[in-house]
Swiss-Prot record:
InterPro entries: NA-bd_OB-fold, Rib_uL2_dom2, Ribosomal_uL2, Ribosomal_uL2_arc_euk, Ribosomal_uL2_C, Ribosomal_uL2_CS, Ribosomal_uL2_dom3, Ribosomal_uL2_RNA-bd_dom. Residues 221-231 have a biased composition (Basic and acidic residues). One of its GO terms (cellular component) is cytosolic large ribosomal subunit. GO terms for molecular function: RNA binding; rRNA binding; structural constituent of ribosome. This is Large ribosomal subunit protein uL2. It comes from the Archaea. Residues 199-240 are annotated as: Disordered. It holds the Pfam family Ribosomal_L2_C. One of its GO terms (biological process) is cytoplasmic translation. Belongs to the universal ribosomal protein uL2 family. Disulfide bonds: none annotated.
């Protein structure tokens, strides 16, 4: 009898397949303020968060509240950032889209007013504020997609810190291992045809090939459910 395939092991939910969320710092969201207020805070530290690709800044606000915020490029220890409708247009400050001029790069953009920020949060990325309309603000996301958002949605001025992260090579497999482990991703990913016959339905043989049709029923047993699951068609094929 063969061993359990990786999909069956993943379903059991051991630590190998779970993200170490107990090490994550916090869910970063915009601080809530009154509409007429401008709240200032001093950056007292810049920290690493295993949950994300960008550094986070620990900010002590005037109301004696300390929280972690997504760090923008150019923001460092000792700098002051502002949150509010009347905040100045400077890197690291957070204010509604309606108060931000066109063409200014922004990050951590809210999808709906008050949700804390959903778009442009990865290291080194930013969204661009394209134009203002009467009842909407057009924002171009890092993917190139444009979004019509409420003018009351808040965003942070600038580019998320940590740019150039992907340009540095891992060099060693150990470095890649630690990176993937921090995200709960099983790595390395071994191909089924490279396994032994006992480990995978496509394993074994004198050369690497599935050895059977890859199409499999939707109702197949868990240990057999690999390949093209319930495929309507396979192969290259053209439009008919």
């Amino acid at each position: 009898m063969g061993r359990r395939i990786q999909g069956q092991r993943r379903g059991r939910g051991t630590s190998t397949f779970r993200a170490p969320s107990h090490r994550y710092k916090a869910e970063l969201s915009h601080k809530r303020t009154e509409d007429t207020d401008v709240l200032a805070g001093e950056v007292i530290d810049v920290e690493h968060d295993p949950a994300r690709s960008a550094p986070v800044a620990r900010v002590a606000f005037e109301d004696d509240d300390q929280r972690l915020v997504l760090a923008s490029e150019g923001v460092g220890v000792g700098d002051t950032i502002e949150i509010g409708i009347s905040a100045t247009i400077e890197e690291g400050n957070t204010l509604p889209l309606a108060e931000i001029p066109e063409g200014v790069p922004v990050c951590n953009v809210e999808s709906h007013p008050g949700d804390g920020g959903k778009f442009a949060r990865a290291g080194g990325v930013n969204a661009d504020l394209v134009t203002h309309e009467r009842d909407a603000t057009i924002v171009e996301l890092p993917s190139g997609e444009t979004k019509r958002l409420s003018p009351d949605c808040r965003a942070t001025i600038g580019v998320v810190a940590g740019g150039g992260r992907t340009e540095k090579p891992f060099v060693k497999a150990g470095n890649k291992h630690h990176k993937m482990k921090a995200r709960g991703t099983k790595w390395p990913r071994v191909r089924g045809v490279a396994m032994n016959a006992v480990d995978h339905p496509f394993g074994g043989g004198g050369r690497q090939h599935p050895g059977r049709p890859k199409s499999v029923s939707r109702d197949a047993a868990p240990g057999r459910k690999v390949g093209d699951i319930a495929s309507k068609r396979t192969g290259r094929g053209g439009n008919e």
